[in-house]
Structure formats: structure tokens, C-alpha cells
Amino acid sequence: MYKRQVTWQKGDVVYDGNASAWGTDCFWAPEVYERDGRYYLFFSANWRHNPNGDLETFRIGVAVADSPSGPFSDLYDRPVFDPGYPVIDANVLWDDDGRVYLYYSRCCYKHPVESELSVWARDKGLFDEIEESWVYGVEMKPDFSGVIGEPVVLLTPPQSASDPQTGWESRSVTAGEVNRRWTEGSYAFKENGTYYMMYSANFYGGQHYAV
């Protein structure tokens, strides 16, 4: 919390999972939005439902509070939806026509992608495969109880070595850091009728992470 953006004071925990919550751990990437006087917290967490024993079961949930400082409570006892793969980094856009869109990042986990870079990495003896995270978008129901239609892929790491974006978006691989390429942390906004999306690439724990 801050006062006049100069003096800061530590706030309390605003959301805490419990034994009956759908999310178990690794609560991740919160974003809070005010709508009609209430505050909605979108976040990622590992889903309790894990019949295959996966290491990552991230899904996106939403909690609600009457104050931006919480406490927040789950709006539903389940994730917003289940795309069939782990997802993080929820971002929400309300369009001028009232429709609501959810953007998220598919995790790299169990998502190997064959590309010119993966062939290069294999030839160099760096990595056998390259896993990637991609940004998707999908329309969301106004009450956040689910989605409308199927998610659409909006952003991926460059697949061609000749793509001018490949250099900076692939440094985690070319530097031998890790066998993954990220497109994550998306933020969508609209300005003068045009839609823009910011995002982050490269290993979030490495020196090449960038926007």
C-alpha cells in the first residue's frame, strides 16, 4: 500500500488458498480489476485435480473482494475453464462493445515445438528438444464463469531463423541457459481503435528476460 506514492507500508495477505480451494500452491501472476464497485483478482495456481500426476497443473481462477486490499474469496470453486494444458498470466480486456476477453500464456511444460531453432540446438548438441509457451486469447463470459468459444493462438516465439525477432526472443536457448522459449506475461490494450499487446520473452530467471 502507498500514501501519495512516497510513503509505503506493508499490507496484509489479500488472498490465501485453503484446504478446500481448487488451487493448491504456486499462486502466480495476480491482476486486479475494478468493475461496478467490486474488485476481481485473476491469478494462476496449481489445480487440485491432477489424475495424471503432472508436475504442473496451472489453471486460472478469479476471486472477489469489496476492497483492493482484500480479503479476496474465490468467486467459484473451480478454475475459470480447463483448456487441457497448464496456463498462467491472466490478463483481461473489456472491449468497447462490452465483450470481455481473457489472455493467458500456455506453459512450456510438455509442449515441445519443432522449429528451425530446435533443429539448430540439436545440431549444436545443446538440447534435444525445445519447449515453448504461447499466448492465447478467448472471449470470457461476463460473470467470469467460463469462456465462449475456443482459445486462439495470438503469439508464439518465432519459428524461422530469418525472423528478425528470433535473435532476442531465443537467447535463453542460444546462450545454453535452458531448453525453453517463453511468450508470456501478456498485457493487451486498445488505443485509437488499434489493439496492442505487450509480452515478455526468454527465461524469467535468466539475464535475457525482456519485454
Features from the language model and the residues they span:
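Carbohydrate-active catalytic/glycan-binding domains of CAZyme proteins
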Residues: 3-211
